[in-house]
């Protein structure tokens, strides 16, 4: 019989990614007794989610772009490898303009959060995250991909890419952090929202 071994779902390793600060508005540190808590207002979650949906549809990480460049320069890469890498770089350049997304099918929004025990939020986080997704899909040039049943045989596009799949887990290892991973079809980003 194998020994029991626990592993976090999508555990974080060392991270050298350069992040940008979206905003400090709606985020504060509050004291209760001798403990400090990170307080995140719903508006901050809405803004962060909107920015995450925008960014995963328009930008590739610098490391990913470098890997594509390395393929183009690799003498052992096949002509097909180079063709695909060059086309992906061209597409990334167009998408970085912020108008056209990298992929026409912008996919179902999947959000996984790990919320530390010293992070306080008011209201339902899922509602604020859904509002950010709604704002992104109704204000940006993103294609709606969600279909909802009308009858047993009929479907209708929701027109806002909701409902999203949102999962928020308690995270005692990172007590004062709220980490999100947003996935949309083929794009991935792992921003740390806030930490004290």
Language model features: what each stretch is:
Residues 186-192:
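Conserved small/polar residues in nucleotide/adenosyl-binding loops
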